[in-house]
């Protein structure tokens, strides 16, 4: 069975991720097939909108399939990882810039690479079990697939909070943070998809939507804004009272697990992208970091600890946020000239 099902259904171009046992993680082949569909449907007059969903109950897409990246990277070959990211980011840009309405149905986990497929459209639908996150700093990477732009656009300093903690958002949080648009009960999704395919009218989404659930992050926003406005990790940590209220104690607990270098770089890129507010600029800056993440960063060690050995005890390059010098951040952020990202 194919990992992805691409077809026309009435007035809709449909993309269904079909690797439920792997939480619909994106393979390199899936990335290329999604890009080809976007290219084909962009100017097709018989396609009015896109509908993107996934099989299974546990996840829309829990990220990228990074097994081969780890195997090639630990052998000293970084070309495959760079190629994967270049082609994935090009697809992400085409998704964000697609000239027709894109409707995505985000059940269960939507993380990392799943955000790049599911969260750049104009009609992003969540339900009661939706959980959305940019968890990259937990594996030594930075928020990518255009996620840095979504974080930069989040209210107040919520983008910094989500990018540095890798905290998970429920449906209400995702809508508040700008990663989703509509809350629609899961049991009504088949009827909504049928209506979208029959009519090609994205207005059906708004008519099916229910009020958004209360957002924990909205309640926490004042404390988050007070602590996550600093220019550096040190500034942010110094702004956190100890002991602090629940939001700050929760943030400190999450950040203690993450790569100090990845967090420092994530903070830098969110601030840089906020000034540009452009998907291609975001992806180009993300690629500067990811292209170097295996050789100079913590990505391979993060994958080893989380996925390969599963010991959850990564040995990061820096012992703490206090130990990340500015020079190490600068070394990750220059343009990539030997294998540049091209759109």
Locate each region found by the language model.
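Conserved CoA-thioester-binding segment of acyl-CoA-metabolizing enzymes
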Residues: 1-53, 93, 331, 343
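Loop-centered beta-sheet repeat module
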Residues: 154-199
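Amphipathic alpha-helical blocks and their helix-capping loop/short-beta junctions
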Residues: 182-258
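C-terminal amphipathic alpha-helical interaction region
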Residues: 289, 297, 301-343
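Glycine- (often His-adjacent) and acidic-residue-rich active-site loop
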Residues: 54-87, 140, 332
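Hydrophobic/aromatic residues within transmembrane alpha-helices
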Residues: 15, 52, 65, 117-118, ...
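Glycine-rich beta-to-alpha active-site loop
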Residues: 95-139, 161-167, 171
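Gly/Pro- and small hydrophobic-enriched strand-loop and loop-to-helix capping segments
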Residues: 121-144, 176-192
């Amino acid at each position: 069975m194919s990992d992805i099902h691409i077809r026309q259904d009435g007035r809709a171009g449909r993309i269904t991720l079909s690797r439920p046992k792997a939480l619909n993680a994106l393979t390199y082949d899936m990335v290329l097939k999604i890009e080809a569909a976007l290219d084909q449907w962009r100017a097709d007059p018989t396609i009015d909108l896109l509908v993107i969903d996934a099989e299974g109950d546990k996840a829309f897409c829990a990220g990228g399939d990074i097994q081969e990246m780890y195997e090639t990277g630990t052998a000293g070959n970084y070309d495959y990882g760079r190629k994967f990211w270049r082609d994935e980011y090009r697809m992400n840009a085409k998704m964000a810039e697609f000239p027709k309405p894109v409707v995505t149905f985000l059940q269960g986990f939507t993380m990392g690479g799943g955000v790049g497929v599911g969260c750049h459209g104009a009609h992003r639908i969540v339900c009661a079990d939706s959980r959305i996150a940019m968890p990259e700093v937990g594996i030594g990477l930075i928020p990518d697939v255009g996620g840095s732009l979504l974080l930069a656009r989040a209210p107040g300093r919520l983008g910094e909070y989500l990018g540095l903690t890798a905290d998970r958002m429920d449906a209400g949080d995702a809508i508040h943070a700008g990663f989703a648009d509509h809350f629609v009960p899961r049991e009504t999704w088949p009827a909504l998809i049928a209506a979208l395919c029959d009519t090609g009218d994205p207005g059906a989404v708004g008519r099916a939507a229910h009020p958004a659930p209360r957002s924990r992050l909205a309640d926490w926003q004042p404390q988050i804004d007070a602590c996550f406005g600093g220019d550096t990790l040190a500034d942010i940590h110094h702004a956190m009272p100890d002991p602090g209220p629940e939001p700050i104690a929760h943030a400190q607990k999450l950040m203690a697990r993450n790569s100090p270098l990845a967090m420092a770089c994530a903070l830098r890129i969110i601030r840089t992208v906020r000034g540009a507010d452009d998907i291609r600029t975001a992806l180009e800056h993300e690629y500067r970091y990811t292209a170097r993440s295996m050789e100079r960063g913590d990505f391979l060690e993060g994958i080893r600890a989380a996925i390969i050995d599963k010991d959850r005890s990564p040995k990061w390059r820096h012992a703490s946020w206090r130990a990340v010098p500015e020079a190490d951040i600068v070394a990750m952020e220059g343009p990539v000239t030997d294998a540049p990202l091209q759109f």
